[in-house]
């Protein structure tokens, strides 16, 4: 299914070549621009403000259509809510590839590009003040995200609570591809390992904890049965609070 997603999106990317977006630049945490395009200027500097506006509209419509298609496919592979209430925890964090992916999952990139479009429609002054770095915004918990393989995970817990073996390679028509999982967890070397940032320690006990969600992966159970199952992987770092008593 992942290969189908990538094929579909690549076809959409080919349609974007006619859009007049040749250069773009956004202040903030790096260039959140159209994936795969280097950015060195502004849309206004290419063909004027009106041409830039037309380019943004064209690309926004195209990316919106891509996202809708991906969400439609995502709904098809999810199990019914009647069978499992945790189905809404499914995220597209799995990729089949012959080498380590160099970018976050596609939906993460599309979300970044949507944020870029929103920022591009702002005035320079509003854009500057909306930059989280300028406002002094910090995450409550420090986290890290990285691609891991089945060799790193080895086993996982499925939706029935059983332990399954995560297969490192998936057979395809032209050979085998490795399974990669995009995991997000609390940063053990971060500044929030002793507690959440911004919490009043006089009244609250706080702790940053890694939480998990379900993704679909090729696995083998204890009876040597191989199949696609939903397994738990690390997907976020959240802050948990307990009130201090006896004060």
From Swiss-Prot:
GO molecular function, one term: growth factor activity
UniProt site (Cleavage): 57-58
Subcellular location: Secreted
Taxonomy, superkingdom: Eukaryota
PTM annotation: Mature BDNF is produced by proteolytic removal of the propeptide, catalyzed by a FURIN family member. In addition, the precursor form is proteolytically cleaved within the propeptide, but this is not an obligatory intermediate for the production of mature BDNF. Can be converted into mature BDNF by plasmin (PLG).
Pfam families (UniProt xref): NGF
Extent of the signal sequence: 1-18
Maturation-removed propeptide residues: 19-128
GO cellular component: axon; dendrite; extracellular space; synaptic vesicle
Glycosylation, residue list: 121
Alphabetical list of PROSITE patterns matching this protein: NGF_1, NGF_2
PANTHER family: BRAIN-DERIVED NEUROTROPHIC FACTOR, NERVE GROWTH FACTOR NGF -RELATED
Assembly behavior: Monomers and homodimers. Binds to NTRK2/TRKB. Can form heterodimers with other neurotrophin family members, such as NTF3 and NTF4 (in vitro), but the physiological relevance of this is not clear. BDNF precursor form: interacts with the heterodimer formed by NGFR and SORCS2. Mature BDNF has much lower affinity for the heterodimer formed by NGFR and SORCS2.
Similarity comment: Belongs to the NGF-beta family.
Protein name, entry field: Neurotrophic factor BDNF precursor form
Species of provenance: Helarctos malayanus (Malayan sun bear)
Encoding gene, per UniProt annotation: BDNF
């Amino acid at each position: 299914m992942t290969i189908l997603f990538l094929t579909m999106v690549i076809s959409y990317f080919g349609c974007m070549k006619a859009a007049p977006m040749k250069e773009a630049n956004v202040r903030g945490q790096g260039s959140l621009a159209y994936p795969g395009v280097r950015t060195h200027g502004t849309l206004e500097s290419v063909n004027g403000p009106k041409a830039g506006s037309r380019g943004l509209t064209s690309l926004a419509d195209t990316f919106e259509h891509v996202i809708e298609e991906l969400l439609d496919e995502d709904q098809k592979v999810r199990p019914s809510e009647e069978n499992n209430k945790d189905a809404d925890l499914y995220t597209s964090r799995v990729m089949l590839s012959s080498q380590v992916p160099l970018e976050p999952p596609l939906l993460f990139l599309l979300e970044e590009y949507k944020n870029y479009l929103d920022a591009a429609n702002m005035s320079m002054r509003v854009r500057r003040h909306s930059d989280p770095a300028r406002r002094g915004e910090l995450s409550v918990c420090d986290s890290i995200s990285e691609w891991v393989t089945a060799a790193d995970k080895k086993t996982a817990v499925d939706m029935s609570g059983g332990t399954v073996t995560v297969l490192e390679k998936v057979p395809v028509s032209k050979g085998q591809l490795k399974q990669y999982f995009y995991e997000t967890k609390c940063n053990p070397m971060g500044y929030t390992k002793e507690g959440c940032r911004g919490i009043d320690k006089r009244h609250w006990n706080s702790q940053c904890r890694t939480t998990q969600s379900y993704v679909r992966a090729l696995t083998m159970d204890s009876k040597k049965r191989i199949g696609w199952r939903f397994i738990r992987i690390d997907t976020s770092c959240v802050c948990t609070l307990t009130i201090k008593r006896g004060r």
